[in-house]
Amino acid sequence: MKQYAIQPATLEFNAEGTPVSRDFDDVYFSNDNGLEETRYVFLGGNRLAERFPVHSHPLFIVAESGFGTGLNFLTLWQAFDSFRSAHPQATLQRLHFISFEKFPLTRDDLALAHQHWPELAPWAEQLQAQWPLPLPGCHRLLLDRGRVTLDLWFGDINELTDQLDATLNQTVDAWFLDGFAPAKNPDMWTPNLFNAMARLARPGATLATFTSAGFVRRGLQEAGFTMQKRKGFGRKREMLCGVMEQHLMPTLSAPWFYRSGSEKRETAIIGGGIASALLSLALLRRGWQVTLYCADDQPAQGASGNRQGALYPLLSKHDAAINRFFPTAFTFARRLYDALPVSFDHDWCGVTQLGWDEKSQQKIAQMLSLALPAGLASALNAEEAEQAVGVTTRCGGITYPAGGWLCPEQLTRAVIALATEQGLQTRFRHTLTSLVAQESRWQLRFTSGETASHETVVLANGHQINRFDQTQPLPVYAVGGQVSHIPTTPALSALRQVLCYDGYLTPQNPHNQQHCIGASYHRGDESTVWREEDQRQNRQRLLDCFPDAKWATEVDVSGNSARCGVRCATRDHLPMVGNVPDYHATLTHYADLADNKTSAAPAPVYPGLFMLGALGSRGLCSAPLCAEILAAQMSNEPIPLDAGTLAALNPNRLWVRKLLKGKAVK
């Protein structure tokens, strides 16, 4: 099954050195002067030079059809940098660029194409460094320390625009209608695309395109744009420009999963782990005032406090939402961790998941049938696995070459320290007991008797997320576990990658000459008391999976060194990110949802109350993207995920799925 494969572009370079698509027999940019044409058609056609200084919002959003070589984006980024240098006090502070590409270039072809424009090299090199793997869906790239956001949507634009979340409606300030010429690629230039452009355009939004084809002009007019012709670039006689002068009212296709944000820019985050830390950074980048309340006397005392944690994507043999979310989350996490200006112990040494018995082999075979890019995951036979991991296991599996391990405790503390430098206020030894809605604010009450008032609140406090009246009905559960710390030996030190089986074993951390092996799993148990039986079982699972491996017998847990923590999980293994749903209102308002879908109102939620939780055992993989999703939602900005996958992360999903089928919610 090839549902997760994206076909890269096949191209050649002509005599002028211009890339030409073999699939469409068309150039990616003009042989004459592609850079100047971009400036004239797209920047000039949208009047960006005159609009930037008077833009009344901190963010300007541009959407594009056909990313190609990225010439339009790089040219715009260069112009935006010049604007920011000339107008440092302007309201407009950040640029958000959304682009769709069916056949993305390889990184090597991208670099070759960029050689055409030496003046764009400072921006092109940053793009090349973060160029994503050819996975379907949205890839968010945070560039220029977060001042520029690039959302690359890989896939067919006419399919992708139908999958966009409703929060993107009426957000785009300018459209770059680009791509191969209509005569070369008629499948793209459709009424469906023109209608999607109109749906996403805010009132007053503009568009520009190089073509003057009559059917394009008429299609855009019918969609709602006011169109006019303009002199074309160079030898081209005409081009088209447009303005969205209407105020369209798009309908919500799935109001029960609708996400609402806040016009306010002040929040309290409850928690102290990696999710809280990364969310703080994401909100601060958007200009929020953030106060972090942590029950402990320092960060990373809960599930984020381990010495080594594996980073690799969760894949499923049958769950499409898991297979859409986790590969994207993993690649985003790697980009974010690499870009963070903080230090923490880590090694992107790779992760190999082994098929040690028939059941695990079948599971891995089904995962490999997803046809994921080799840069994300690929098959290994027994011999290849031994070469990759450095120890003998006598079984093959699946390897994640970009995975590895990191120290969650160090990462969490470093990120919170960085956020504090950027304005984060921290309040340690503050255990929240209740939340009380007071007009348009939330009052927080703590065990000390102290209270605080905030415009919005985010619950990101791990397995304690359902301790409040508003969250008590959430279908989440605690999972206690113990990770053992073992000394390295000459045989164990040969391990080069994180090894996953019916447990996991990390390579040694050179800073302490120890490995981590784990982890036990006790559903419903919130105890953090060390257990001798867990220590023994962590070792025994390794021996049971690899009974002939002599190196495995050197695992020594007798030192009784371990760390106990509690995860927060869900039945479907996906996080919960978004508005905190109002359980009783949901059941009341949606009692007849199965029979009245067309008249359903937006999902009942607690205004200004959000959550980021249920990260399970994959928080290091999912927390970065979840934090970015929630920060974007709270800020009413584009969310980097399709509507279907976002629905699978909605905290109300398990209730709504039953209500949609007319089943009782228990």
Swiss-Prot record:
Principal location: cytoplasm
EC number(s) on file: 2.1.1.61, 1.5.-.-
The UniProt record lists the keyword Oxidoreductase: yes
Keyword Nucleotide-binding attributed: no
Pfam families (alphabetical): DAO, Methyltransf_30
Keywords for the protein's UniProt record, in alphabetical order: Cytoplasm, FAD, Flavoprotein, Methyltransferase, Multifunctional enzyme, Oxidoreductase, S-adenosyl-L-methionine, Transferase, tRNA processing
GO biological process: methylation; tRNA wobble uridine modification
InterPro entries: FAD-dep_OxRdtase, FAD/NAD-bd_sf, MnmC-like_methylTransf, SAM-dependent_MTases_sf, tRNA_MAMT_biosynth_bifunc_MnmC, tRNA_MNMC2, tRNA_S-uridine_synth_MnmC_C
Compartment annotation: Cytoplasm
Needed cofactors: FAD
Region entry tRNA (mnm(5)s(2)U34)-methyltransferase, spans: 1-245
Location of the region described as FAD-dependent cmnm(5)s(2)U34 oxidoreductase in the Swiss-Prot/TrEMBL record: 270-666
Gene Ontology MF: a single term: tRNA (5-methylaminomethyl-2-thiouridylate)(34)-methyltransferase activity
Reactions catalysed: 5-aminomethyl-2-thiouridine(34) in tRNA + S-adenosyl-L-methionine = 5-methylaminomethyl-2-thiouridine(34) in tRNA + S-adenosyl-L-homocysteine + H(+)
GO CC field: cytoplasm
Function: Catalyzes the last two steps in the biosynthesis of 5-methylaminomethyl-2-thiouridine (mnm(5)s(2)U) at the wobble position (U34) in tRNA. Catalyzes the FAD-dependent demodification of cmnm(5)s(2)U34 to nm(5)s(2)U34, followed by the transfer of a methyl group from S-adenosyl-L-methionine to nm(5)s(2)U34, to form mnm(5)s(2)U34.
Protein family according to the UniProt entry: In the N-terminal section; belongs to the methyltransferase superfamily. tRNA (mnm(5)s(2)U34)-methyltransferase family.
Name of the protein in question: tRNA 5-methylaminomethyl-2-thiouridine biosynthesis bifunctional protein MnmC
Organism per entry: Salmonella typhimurium (strain LT2 / SGSC1412 / ATCC 700720)
Name of the coding gene: mnmC
